[in-house]
C-alpha cells in the first residue's frame, strides 16, 4: 500500500483517513475470526494480513501527524481527531487479541 502524504490534507481529511483505514482493518479482523470459525484458516490469515496493511497505512498517517507537530506545526484538538485516534488504538488492540486467539486455536487444533 502506497504511503499517503498528508501535507495537502485538512485536519478533518486526515482524521477521516485514520478512521477509514482503521475501520477497514477492524472489519477484516472480525471477518478473520468468522472465517476461522467456518474452517477457512487460510482466508482468516489473509484477512489478518489485509488488516495489517490498513493498520500500517493508518500508522504512517498518524506518524506524519506527530512529525508535523514535533516540527513546530501545532495540530488543533478536535473531537473528530480524538475519535480517529481512539478508533486506531482500539483496532490495534483488537488485532493483537484476535491474532493471539487464532494462534491459540491453531496450537490446540480447535
UniProtKB/Swiss-Prot annotation:
Any one Pfam family match given in the protein's UniProt record, by short name: PTS_IIA
Subcellular location per UniProt equals:
Cytoplasm
Q: Which UniProt keywords apply?
A: Cytoplasm, Kinase, Phosphoprotein, Phosphotransferase system, Polysaccharide transport, Sugar transport, Transferase, Transport
**Induction of its expression:** Up-regulated by konjac glucomannan and by cellobiose and mannobiose, the possible degradation products of glucomannan. Repressed by glucose via the carbon catabolite repression system. Also repressed by GmuR.
Superkingdom of origin organism: Bacteria
**Could you name the active-site residues?**
83
Q: Which GO terms describe its biological process?
A: phosphoenolpyruvate-dependent sugar phosphotransferase system; polysaccharide transport
Molecular function (GO) terms listed?
kinase activity; protein-phosphocysteine-sugar phosphotransferase activity
A single GO cellular-component term from the record reads: cytoplasm
Start and end residues of each PTS EIIA type-3 domain: 9-107
Q: Which residues carry this modification: Phosphohistidine?
A: 83
Its domain description in UniProt is: The PTS EIIA type-3 domain is phosphorylated by phospho-HPr on a histidyl residue. Then, it transfers the phosphoryl group to the PTS EIIB type-3 domain.
* Job of this protein: The phosphoenolpyruvate-dependent sugar phosphotransferase system (sugar PTS), a major carbohydrate active transport system, catalyzes the phosphorylation of incoming sugar substrates concomitantly with their translocation across the cell membrane. The enzyme II GmuABC PTS system is involved in the transport of oligo-glucomannans such as cellobiose or mannobiose.
This one is known as: PTS system oligo-beta-mannoside-specific EIIA component
**Annotated organism of origin:** Bacillus subtilis (strain 168)
Amino acid at each position: 500500500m502506497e504511503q499517503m502524504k498528508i501535507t495537502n490534507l485538512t485536519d478533518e481529511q486526515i482524521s477521516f483517513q485514520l478512521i477509514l483505514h482503521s475501520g477497514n482493518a477492524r472489519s477484516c479482523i472480525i471477518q478473520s475470526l468468522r472465517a476461522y470459525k467456518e474452517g477457512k484458516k487460510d482466508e482468516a490469515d489473509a484477512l489478518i494480513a489485509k488488516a495489517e496493511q490498513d493498520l500500517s497505512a493508518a500508522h504512517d498517517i498518524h506518524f506524519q501527524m506527530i512529525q508535523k507537530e514535533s516540527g513546530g506545526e501545532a495540530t488543533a484538538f478536535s473531537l473528530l481527531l480524538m475519535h480517529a485516534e481512539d478508533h486506531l488504538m482500539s483496532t490495534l488492540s483488537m488485532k493483537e487479541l484476535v491474532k493471539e486467539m487464532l494462534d491459540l486455536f491453531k496450537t490446540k487444533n480447535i
